[in-house]
């Protein structure tokens, strides 16, 4: 296990970090670069109270957004607006115009964006030798 600086810990086949380990202030926190992700794009955004991003779209990359903290409004190219609270997701296809606004006048909003282009999507997870459950002895109800 090695320390990657600023609290990012990298081990053999993994990396862990807190949001603040990936940067300070408002704007982008580069999850992909900070943790060494290579299979997809990943960023966290810290959006100040009342702030709105510019509109943007992508040529190939669809994006999945997860609102971690606060309340935001997504405005799409078709003119629709959707308010999302912490714990909510939004998927946006590559060519769809989008912009995001922090609905609070006093609190930051934090959201995570995971992006990638069409390709392999499948389930290839498996249990390591000797394991019989993904949850060990602590399986949640219904798992």
Per-region residue spans from a language model:
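A short, N-terminal "cap"/entry segment at the start of jelly-roll beta-barrel domains
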Residues: 1-39, 54, 122-143
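Conserved short histidine dyad/triad with adjacent acidic residue
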Residues: 28-30, 43-59
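A generic "binding-loop/recognition-motif" signal
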Residues: 60, 80, 96-97, 117
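Glycine- and acidic-residue-biased ligand/ion/polar-headgroup-sensing regions
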Residues: 60-62, 66-72
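Short acidic-glycine-tyrosine-enriched beta hairpin
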Residues: 78-94
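A short hydrophobic beta-strand segment most commonly corresponding to one strand
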Residues: 91, 106-121
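Asparagine-centered strand-capping/turn motif at beta-strand->loop junctions
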Residues: 101-104
């Amino acid at each position: 296990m090695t320390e990657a600086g600023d609290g990012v810990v990298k081990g053999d086949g993994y990396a862990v970090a807190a949001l603040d380990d990936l940067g300070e202030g408002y704007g982008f926190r580069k999850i992909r670069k900070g943790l060494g992700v290579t299979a997809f794009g990943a960023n966290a955004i810290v959006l100040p109270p009342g702030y709105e991003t510019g509109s943007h779209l992508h040529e190939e990359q669809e994006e999945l957004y997860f609102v971690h903290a606060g309340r935001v409004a997504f405005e799409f190219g078709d003119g629709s607006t959707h308010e999302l609270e912490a714990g909510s997701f939004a998927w946006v296809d590559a060519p769809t115009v989008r912009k995001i606004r922090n609905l609070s006048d006093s609190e930051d909003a934090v959201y995570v964006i995971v992006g990638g282009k069409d390709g392999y999507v499948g389930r290839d997870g498996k249990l390591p030798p000797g394991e019989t459950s993904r949850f060990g002895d602590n399986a949640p109800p219904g798992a």
